[in-house]
């Protein structure tokens, strides 16, 4: 037998959901004037409504219609100002049905609708309308949308408007909407470092705005112009004839321009958060260095001794280097680069940025540290057009090799000390390109794979012979470290003694923990004064069972959230709260040790080191 009823939303057995029918029936009350007990007047148009529905849906109307004021009288007519009939019609439909159609409305109506949602306290409607407005931003509507978003403190819509205006700064300056901006909104736009139009264009647009807004304080507006960024010709032939800036202000700008370092000027730059701008898409190119084409092609897998990298010879005066020119001045605070890592070599280098290729500011200095593979670098935000990477050392030869380069602005929080990152998360992982460069294991990086449960007499640990060698971990780059954590092999009741040293160059070592006279078992938490470290060396000095020191897991800095060991846990199960690390496909693969003891025993020795 056929079913003549319309399709209904699927509901679970035992649940009835007829909300759509309820919405339709209540919405039908808007069509006629039946049962209406209050009337709103907007632009001389009357809107009959129902007090109880309005009060149930909105705290504002509840107070207005049932608060004992004049509007609470029966059959009252309530005039509403500062809105339009079209926007109020949309709001009433939303109140009665929970629905609103935005796609067919003009931007002005949508902004009035957004204002009503804010005024009457409909946060979900406010969010949904803001999200739709984000999708229809264009040169004609972005300024008035930004004005409303700023007025009502709508962070997402405000941010999207700013990003759109930043990427279309010159077009926005020339638009009619720019002249209609409020003074507050205008200053919020042009004071941004990321509003990267030429300063002359900004000055002329502000001059035009002042002519259309004669009652405003023009001096305050003109203070937003960064006069030192303008040329002498522009200052004398464009700014001076306007009469809006004093001769002293112009002379001060000339003085700042002539006496300051170029990189100390308050430049504007393009801001594209969380996206690599060192790409052909954004007009970036390698302008100095050998084999330029490989650096920005995005290929981080297909490289070897002969291809897939850019390079430069390492010389004592550091005149050589690899230089990238960005498509336009940009704001960056994060660089990622991949050093050639098909063997165990390490590099030292520094990175400088510039606007004119004459004045360079050093933002990263790893010239006294040994680094390998992926470098994740952070520094205070800078506006720059040129980036120069200069290699100062290669442990194998006199050539500096880079496989890939990325730069961007990131909103990720980071802490710097002495120019180095102070990590909060464990950086001794395969994904972070850390490596075990000394010590014996069936898999050389088993110590760093995050597995603290699966180990036994035969596998899952790294070891060294007491009195000979050590376990050494190399981090991909120097960090400021103040803690580490170890899991000593604990499948029986043995105990160990050991000490820990750190280094930045494998030459000078600093002892940070001395437990040579302590009986240690299982998990070890080591804290010490924070200091730069690229290498961590763990040296076992005693084992109550045999002549080999065994370590299952290493991390730095210590991850406090992982310290949930159960006192009743069986030996060998490790810490179940520690997640496994995923293998980075770009990380170097370690060869297996040439000689491994069948169980924790005295026959360990260090793996052979490659010298290619």
Curated annotation (Swiss-Prot):
Disulfide cross-links: none
Residue ranges occupied by any BACK domain in the UniProt entry: 142-240
InterPro entries per UniProt: BACK (IPR011705), BTB/POZ_dom (IPR000210), BTB_POZ_domain_cont_9 (IPR052407), BTBD9_BACK-like_dom (IPR034091), FA58C (IPR000421), Galactose-bd-like_sf (IPR008979), SKP1/BTB/POZ_sf (IPR011333)
Bias (Low complexity) ranges: 589-612
Disordered: region residues: 559-612
Annotated tissue distribution: Expressed in the brain (at protein level).
GO CC terms in record: glutamatergic synapse
Stretches that traverse the bilayer: none
Record-level GO BP terms: adult locomotory behavior; circadian behavior; circadian sleep/wake cycle, non-REM sleep; long-term memory; modulation of chemical synaptic transmission; multicellular organismal-level iron ion homeostasis; regulation of synaptic vesicle endocytosis; sensory perception of temperature stimulus
A family per Pfam: BACK
Stored CDD domains: BACK_BTBD9, BTB_POZ_BTBD9
Highest taxon in the source lineage: Eukaryota
Ranges of residues in domain BTB: 36-104
Record PANTHER family: BTB/POZ DOMAIN-CONTAINING PROTEIN 9, BTB_POZ DOMAIN-CONTAINING PROTEIN 9
This protein's name: BTB/POZ domain-containing protein 9
Gene: Btbd9
